[in-house]
Amino acid sequence: MKLTCVLIVAVLILTACQLIAADDSRDLKRFSRRKMRDGMLNTKNMKRQCLPPLSLCTMDDDECCDDCXLFLCLVTS
């Protein structure tokens, strides 16, 4: 009886972890926080200096890098 209860609790915890992880990763490329922030900040009155393509970057950079892969800035536009 105790083993059954432990197994049920373990399955419930693992299911909850799966659901939490699935919510965070849904449409991550299409609606990333960085692109949403850049869309809100992209106005006619505001000009920002962008990193040139293939320059070194980190995920914390604010220099309008579209995607940072292997520490290189990939700019699509």
Curated annotation (Swiss-Prot):
Keywords tagged on the record: Cleavage on pair of basic residues, Disulfide bond, Knottin, Neurotoxin, Pyrrolidone carboxylic acid, Secreted, Signal, Toxin
A Pfam family per the record: Conotoxin
GO molecular function, one term: ion channel inhibitor activity
Disulfide links within the chain: C50-C65, C57-C68, C64-C73
Propeptide feature ranges: 23-46
Tissue-wise expression: Expressed by the venom duct.
Location relative to the cell: Secreted
Main localization of the protein described in the UniProt heading: secreted
Record-listed Pyrrolidone carboxylic acid modification sites: Q49
GO CC annotation terms, alphabetical: extracellular region
Signal peptide: 1-22
Family: Belongs to the conotoxin O1 superfamily.
Note on domains (UniProt): The presence of a 'disulfide through disulfide knot' structurally defines this protein as a knottin. The cysteine framework is VI/VII (C-C-CC-C-C).
Name listed for the protein in its UniProt record: Conotoxin ArMKLT2-0251
